[in-house]
């Protein structure tokens, strides 16, 4: 089996549309919804563990893992965390070497699921909650994956270094010479979040925006989780992109950071989760997938991580801005795939990284 490049995804682009909107044409093949039964729990306990590959923040993953282990004593969870683009290559290399270590995969680049499904790498599984409470455009028609979380890549600023009236209000404002040497951003070749955000910004603003931004002496970091941290430490005054939820959590913890929802719109990212057909612990994987998409766990994502959920029964945490009140940029994972190599090449040339 060959190692997949991002271009391989294009072969499946007409068969699927993933990430904010899944293909409606592929409906009717999903398996019957499965409940979390005592028999499933017992089978999972016999397997003893579940291995999750994920791009979610390590503290979030650890909190999630502890909650799962508390809910199902006797089953441990091993979380392998990395940037989505790195995970994409790692999984391809492992499959090429006939290594099947992962049970469950969660990615911040929804388009990764296109080649995984196309190559038969995913196991169909639909939990009761996914079937009942997840909109069709946020779950695969064949039951291979569902959107576990939604988040944003926003602008932000350090309120100890920047007055509210002086803070940027738009992406165009980031091009003001006064922000030169004062900004930080993530890298699209490492982070699926930043890859998706970069595509949406190129689509809306053109490469001209990034050409001008690259002249602003921006601090370059890898993960989308890094810019909020640099911001809170005062290493830079403004965040050009990065996880909005990281900023929200830091602000709630008393750090001097403030998110900005740009007038042009804010990039939106979906993070689906699926089970590998080759999962060494298939019952534990099903149990985790079912548990992950329950109302209680989805509420956890909202309350603890400041991300968003499409589960029909969850509610926004008091005091936080609702996603419906934010102007959003539209997701288009097939478009990301069509431009991914161009984005990597041009970005590296412009930012010299």
Regions found by a protein language model. Name each.
Residues 1-17:
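N-terminal secretory signal peptides and thylakoid transit peptides that target proteins
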Residues 34-45, 49-51, 55-74:
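Short, polar/charged alpha-helical segment
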Residues 54-65, 77-95, 100-228, 232-235:
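Extracytoplasmic ligand-binding site segments that recognize negatively charged/polar headgroups
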Residues 111-115, 237-256:
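A ligand-binding cleft/hinge motif common to bilobed small-molecule-binding domains
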Residues 150-152, 179-189, 211-214, 220-221, 253-279, 292-316:
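Periplasmic-binding protein-like
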Residues 154-161, 198-199, 269-281, 300-301:
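A bilobed periplasmic-binding-protein/Venus flytrap-type ligand-binding module shared by bacterial periplasmic
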Residues 297, 317-353:
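Extracellular/periplasmic bilobal clamshell ligand-binding domains
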């Amino acid at each position: 089996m060959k190692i997949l490049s991002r271009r391989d995804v294009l072969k499946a682009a007409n068969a699927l549309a993933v990430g904010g909107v899944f293909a409606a044409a592929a409906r009717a093949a999903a398996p019957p919804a499965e409940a979390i039964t005592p028999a499933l729990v017992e089978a999972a306990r016999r397997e003893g563990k579940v291995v999750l590959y994920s791009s979610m923040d390590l503290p979030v993953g650890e909190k999630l893992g502890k909650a799962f282990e508390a809910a199902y004593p006797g089953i441990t969870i091993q979380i392998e965390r990395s940037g989505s683009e790195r995970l994409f290559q790692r999984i391809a290399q492992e499959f090429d070497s006939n290594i099947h270590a992962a049970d469950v995969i969660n990615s911040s680049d929804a388009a990764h699921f296109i080649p995984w499904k196309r190559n038969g790498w995913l196991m169909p599984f639909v939990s009761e909650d996914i079937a009942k409470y997840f909109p069709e455009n946020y779950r695969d028609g064949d039951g291979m994956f569902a959107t576990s979380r939604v988040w944003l890549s926003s602008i932000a600023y350090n309120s100890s270094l920047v007055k509210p009236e002086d803070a940027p209000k738009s992406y165009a404002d980031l091009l003001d010479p006064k922000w030169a040497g004062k900004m930080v951003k993530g890298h699209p070749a490492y982070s699926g979040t930043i890859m998706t955000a970069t595509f949406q910004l190129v689509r809306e603003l053109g490469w001209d925006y990034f050409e001008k931004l690259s002249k602003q002496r921006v601090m370059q970091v890898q993960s989308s989780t890094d810019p909020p941290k640099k911001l809170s430490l005062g290493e830079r005054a403004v965040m050009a992109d990065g996880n909005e939820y990281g900023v929200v959590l830091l602000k709630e913890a008393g750090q001097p950071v403030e998110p900005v929802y740009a007038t042009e719109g804010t990039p939106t990212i979906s993070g689906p989760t699926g089970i590998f057909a080759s999962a060494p612990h298939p019952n534990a994987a099903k149990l985790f997938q079912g548990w992950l998409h329950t109302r209680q766990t989805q509420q956890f994502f909202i309350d603890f991580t400041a991300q968003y959920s499409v589960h029909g029964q969850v509610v926004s945490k008091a005091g936080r801005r609702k996603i419906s009140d934010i102007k959003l940029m539209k997701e288009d994972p097939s478009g990301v795939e069509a431009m991914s190599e161009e984005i990597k090449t041009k970005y590296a040339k412009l930012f010299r990284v």
